A protein has these predicted regions:
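Active-site-proximal structural scaffolding
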Residues: 18-19, 39, 50, 68, ...
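A short hydrophobic/aromatic micro-motif that marks alpha-helical segments and, especially, helix-coil
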Residues: 12, 94-95, 168, 214
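Active-site phosphate/pyrophosphate-binding segments
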Residues: 115-116, 121-247
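Long, well-ordered, tryptophan-enriched scaffold segments
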Residues: 56-58, 63-167
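Short helix-capping/linker segments at secondary-structure and domain boundaries
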Residues: 94-102, 182, 198-205, 279
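Generic structural "secondary-structure junction" signal
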Residues: 6, 10, 21, 78-80, ...
Length: 286
């Protein structure tokens, strides 16, 4: 969720009910039937919308989930933490088979190719060069390359890319599982590149690649008081703050409000969150 504003400026995406206008639904690590209060009504809206559109649904997730549960047209199991590599392999096919929405990329996007590369950016520092192996790492992100990382057969990656490139509107979304790892925010942003490449952003039946939007109920909350302590760290680094707090700095560890921590964490008050255990990117460490 925190990665989307760095791509779009907000977390917004199309609602589940808009799938009634879609031809294809692709879910990356998304399991609303189990993670949103046992579905929270989303599963019902999903089924109703698909019944109206007859959209094909592909679920990409390591284990078979309740969201799939016979509703999916295809389940593609993937090695955990490798969604970004899959996206790169798909992007390679989209680019090489001319399945990208070039007018959309030229008009609305920055940094896809040399035409929209910002002034001062390094040569071949654009997304297209990265995918084709013309960037700094020199590695072409071919389906064969992606297959070795993800465990998904090469021909299935190619087929998936063509399905995404040829089915418009396509509703591409993700859950929060893919980014529950080190540098996971980049995985979330990678998934968002698929609707960008294919011009499925901002249209009926499309999506931004974010988690599906749904109906909300306004609830009363306690007022938020001003915190006199201005120093803060990422919630994922609480383990480091216990083990080596005084060594953590702003430049290396993302400490905010101070150049470095003065003391390690000695007490944790955890409320309405589970970053202490199973929502952390390194549960072996927690």
């Amino acid at each position: 969720a925190c990665a989307m504003p760095y791509t779009y400026g907000s977390n917004d995406g199309n609602s589940t009910s808009d799938i009634e206008n879609s031809k294809l639904v692709v879910m990356f690590g998304n399991n609303p039937a189990e993670t949103r209060m046992s579905g929270g009504g989303i599963t019902w809206y999903l089924e109703q919308a698909r019944e109206r559109s007859n959209a094909r649904m592909i679920v990409i997730v390591p284990r078979y989930t309740d969201t799939a549960a016979g509703r999916e047209d295809e389940w593609i199991p993937i090695r955990p933490g490798t969604d970004a590599a899959l996206v790169a392999g798909i992007a390679w096919v989209l680019i090489n088979e001319d399945l990208v929405d070039q007018p959309f990329l030229d008009k609305y996007c920055v940094g896809y190719d040399e035409k929209t590369l910002p002034a001062g950016a390094p040569a071949n520092g654009h997304y297209k060069a990265y995918i084709l192996g013309e960037g700094d790492d020199g590695i072409a992100k071919t389906p064969q390359w992606a297959s070795r990382i993800t465990g998904i057969p090469t021909d299935r990656i190619i087929k998936l890319a063509r399905e995404i490139g040829m089915s418009k509107p396509a509703y591409i979304c993700q859950g929060w599982g893919p980014q529950r790892q080190a540098n996971g925010e980049l995985t979330a942003r990678a998934i968002a590149m698929l609707p960008i490449l294919t011009g499925n952003v901002g249209i009926n039946g499309g999506n931004s690649g974010a988690r599906e939007s749904t109906y909300t109920i306004t609830i009363e909350r306690l007022p938020v008081l001003e915190n006199p302590v201005k120093t803060a760290i990422s919630c994922f680094t609480w383990t480091d703050a216990i083990a080596r707090g005084p060594e953590m700095t702003a430049s290396r560890d993302g400490v905010r409000g101070k150049e470095k921590l003065d003391v390690p964490i000695k007490f944790i008050w955890n409320y309405a969150g589970n970053t202490i255990t199973n929502q952390h990117s390194d549960i072996n460490k927690t």
